[in-house]
C-alpha cells in the first residue's frame, strides 16, 4: 500500500476511509435526504415572496408617479428603477437554486444506491424524477419574474422618454 496524508490508497486505487469519516458522510447525507426539499423550496418561496412584494410595490408606484415632480432625469431614473435589481437577481438565480436541489437529489439517489448495495432501476428513476422537481420550482419562480422584470423595464423606458420629451424644449 502507498500512504498519502491521512488516507491511504490500496493497490486497486480504492479510497479507504476510517469509521468516523464514514459516519460523518452518512450523517450529512441523511440530513440532506430529509431536509433538502424544505431548504430549496423554502429559499424559492422567500424569493417568490419578494417578487410578489416588489411587483405590487412597483405597480402602485408606477400608477401614482408624477414624472413632472422630478428635477432631473437621474432622480427620476433612480425612483423608477428602485427594486428592479432585486427582481433581476431573483430571476437570474432562481434556476440555480433549483439546480442545486436537483444535484443534491441526484447525489442522494446515488448514495441510496450505494447503501443498498444493488441497482434497482425503479428506485433510481423515482429518485431522479423527484430530484428534478427542484429545477422545475426554480424555473417556476424565474420565468414569471423575468416577464415582470422586462415589463417594468419597458415601463421605465416609456416614462423616461416621456420625461425627456416634456423637458426637451426647456
Model-predicted segments: where are they?
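Short, Lys/Arg-enriched N-terminal segments with co-localized hydrophobic residues
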Residues: 3-28
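Residue-level marker of positions within ordered structural domains that often coincide
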Residues: 12, 57, 168
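Hydrophobic alpha-helical transmembrane segments of small proteolipidic membrane proteins, enriched
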Residues: 21-160
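Cytoplasmic juxtamembrane regions at transmembrane-helix boundaries
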Residues: 157-170
Amino acid at each position: 500500500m502507498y500512504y498519502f496524508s491521512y488516507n491511504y490508497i490500496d493497490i486497486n486505487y480504492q479510497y479507504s476511509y476510517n469509521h468516523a469519516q464514514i459516519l460523518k458522510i452518512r450523517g450529512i447525507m441523511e440530513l440532506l435526504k430529509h431536509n433538502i426539499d424544505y431548504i430549496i423550496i423554502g429559499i424559492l418561496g422567500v424569493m417568490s415572496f419578494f417578487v410578489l412584494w416588489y411587483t405590487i410595490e412597483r405597480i402602485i408606484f408606477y400608477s401614482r408617479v408624477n414624472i413632472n415632480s422630478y428635477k432631473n432625469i437621474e432622480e427620476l431614473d433612480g425612483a423608477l428603477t428602485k427594486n428592479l435589481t432585486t427582481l433581476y437577481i431573483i430571476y437570474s438565480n432562481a434556476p440555480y437554486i433549483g439546480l442545486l436541489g436537483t444535484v443534491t437529489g441526484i447525489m442522494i439517489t446515488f448514495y441510496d444506491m450505494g447503501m443498498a448495495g444493488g441497482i434497482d432501476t425503479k428506485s433510481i428513476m423515482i429518485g431522479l424524477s423527484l430530484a428534478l422537481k427542484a429545477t422545475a420550482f426554480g424555473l417556476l419562480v424565474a420565468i414569471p419574474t423575468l416577464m415582470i422584470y422586462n415589463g417594468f423595464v419597458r415601463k421605465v423606458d416609456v416614462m423616461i422618454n416621456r420625461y425627456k420629451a416634456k423637458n426637451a424644449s426647456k
